[in-house]
Regions:
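Conserved Switch II/interswitch segment of TRAFAC-class P-loop GTPases
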Residues: 98-117, 141-143
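NTP-binding/hydrolysis catalytic cores, primarily Walker-type P-loop NTPases
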Residues: 181-205
Length: 205
């Protein structure tokens, strides 16, 4: 049962957007998916409450913000959305569960500095050897200098860059209905599906 953790200590980098869409991808493949939310804001849980009955099922993994335990039997794939400022024993508990960690990163100097420290902590963690870590650029406008700086930063990390997701209203509109880019006709989100190809391939390894 793969456990995918979406983590970055910086708030507002797109963790919930990434977590819900990763869960949506697994659900689109017919897996028994649980989406856990260790963030006190419970954004992912709220999103699940908006999900229409006709959509592919994604179950709620009841994660107490102060106690993270393994999900129930019968689950084939788990996605865990984590809060900003994740550290200490909660950080350790999350990484004990993780098979894969996706770190979302925005093209901002503040995000880059905060994420660099976090990636160093991941590399030094005692469970680092069993985790795969990948980077996803979030809300990236490829035409900007900031995007170029982000690419320069991630290319020097020695970690796989899974993809760059553009800044689009598609994610906002779909999230408001409890949906993901994997729940609608591909023709409606063609550019976004192209950007997800590398992420999906990495998730399936």
């Amino acid at each position: 049962m793969p456990v995918v953790v979406i983590a970055n200590p910086k708030g507002g980098v797109g963790k919930t957007t990434l977590a819900t869409n990763v869960a949506g991808y697994y659900a689109s493949k017919g897996h028994s998916v649980m989406l856990g939310d260790a963030d006190r804001q419970q954004s992912s849980r709220l999103w699940l409450g908006l999900r229409p009955p006709a959509a592919r099922p994604i179950a709620t993994w009841d994660v107490n913000a102060d106690l993270i335990v393994r999900p129930p039997k019968g689950t084939t794939h788990v996605v865990l959305d984590t809060p900003g400022g994740l550290h200490g024993w909660r950080f350790n508990d999350v990484l004990k569960l993780a098979d894969k960690v996706i770190v979302p990163l925005q093209p901002s100097v503040f995000d880059i500095f905060a994420t660099r420290t976090f990636l160093d902590q991941l590399a030094e963690h005692k469970h680092a050897g069993k985790m795969q870590v990948g980077i996803v650029g979030m809300r990236v406008d490829s035409r900007t200098i900031a995007a170029d700086k982000l690419r320069g930063f991630v290319e020097g990390l020695g970690l796989p860059v899974l993809g760059y997701l553009r800044d689009t209203q598609n994610y906002i509109h779909l999230a408001a209905r409890g949906l993901t880019v994997f729940d609608v006709a591909p023709s409606r989100v063609e550019k976004d599906m192209e950007q997800w190809q590398g992420i999906c391939q990495w998730l399936d390894r």
